[in-house]
Amino acid sequence: TFITLHSDNLFISKQGYWSEISNIDIPDRQLLTNTLWKARSKISKLYNSIVPYVNDRRKFSIQKNHISIEFFTNYNVEITIEEKEFTFENWKDFPIYITGGWFEEYTYMQLKLLEDLGTIYDLRIGLEIGFKEKEKSNKPFRFDNLKNMFSDTYQELDITFTDGKKLYIVECKAGNIKSEYIMKLQNITKYFGGLKGQGILASCFPPSNKILKKKIFDSKNIKLVSGQYFNEELTNIF
């Protein structure tokens, strides 16, 4: 309700339930996610090599930084991380998962602990907002502005939840933080969450750039959780 209260001509086109994630119940998937968190520095160095395979799902084989990944034409996966071996069958979206989707799932898993405690509510992952144009009226519609802001006709929110009073929007970054990520999260949070909306920039690595740190610090509606103390920083928000 927080999203529809603060937005015009919007509808939820994808509910963002955990169970909607393809192959989410594959055995050992959560174990792999936790393992990737521990090896986040090493896996981040492989993203550029894997990204070309995300759209067409071609097979690939990569061995680097004590990580071995085999993705086959039948979508089976073999991955070894620091002597931990994992095998999966028919995981078509694995290239998306391994290039950053895993971090969204890791962040969700940490927040799920808070939801189970009753600290937060209505936790979603990958919720999508659709825009629909109303019939012509004298009041100008901001559809073009939205399209320019979000670069498409819909917006996917990595993770959303509420504490019962305001909407929280989490933007997850498995790689380095860039200035445009901060501006994007500020805009999305304000638009969908209103003046009380709170953005959380979740990152595997804390920003090293002083300007980026200052931009986040000066922001009134964004909090940063990152790096070694990620879980503690996330919990301390509440």
Which residues fall in each region the model found?
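Intrinsically disordered, low-complexity Ser/Thr/Pro/Gly-rich regulatory segments
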Residues: 1-238
